[in-house]
Amino acid sequence: GVERLDRVDHEFVNVHVGDRTIPALLAAVPEATAVTLSWRLFGNDGVVDYVDEPLTETFTRAAPHVLHWPWRALLFKTLVRNDGSYGKLGVHRPRAPDEARLAGQRWVDGSGRVLPAAFHRGRIFLDPGRDSHALVQLNHYPLGAVQSFVLKRDRGRAVHAEGGLDAGYWVERNFIDEEDRSILALDSRVLRDGLRGDRVLGPLHQAAVDWRHRRFRTLMQEDAWRSFYGQLRMAGPTRVLSQAEAESIWKPYIRG
């Protein structure tokens, strides 16, 4: 189980220091007990059809490193030392902190900056207007191809029952302002070929690919799903808001 692991994380970790491995990242911040791996959102970039190719190769345009809105673009996952300071793993961060151990916590962001004590207990997103990707970023592909997003909505969200996978979700994540191919230097072809050639995993993977194509064709028999598909096809890239524009959304209305 995870209890035996030193550190725990998942997703597309993209390290920018040393030999681009997790040990190289930890060597760059040796005193850190936790590193927040800030998302970099990769948008749809006009890809319509689902194809069985790696996300990292298909989607290479992303949000700028500095964003002021939406706050969901500032979410992070956590690479945390598994030393008993927290009793549970959460979706974005460890939970159930041991109060007696918190004084020894040292959290840093993906640029190596020390984060305030509020992060030791409950924060799940970073402050806006800062580049938190100098050492490491988490490549996040929330949309995929248009057909894939239709299937994602059909499936539903794995963690959050509230908040639909609707056009609003799409708009908040469809950033394609900068090209970023940095993760492609970490060649995964040998590993992928090995998995696809596995006598158990290979057929299961192909069955999943075939199912996705069949399911999409089935959904397109219904007017509501065709309408949603059409909405996504008409939607353009998301516009990045300036700091002033972002602050005008919340600053006049939130006190304190």
Identify the meaning behind each predicted range.
Residues V15-L241:
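Catalytic-site signature of metal-activated, phosphate-bearing donor transferases
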Residues P237, A244-R255:
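Charge-dense, extended regions
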Residues G1-N14:
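Short beta-strand-to-loop acidic/aromatic patch adjacent to the donor-nucleotide binding site
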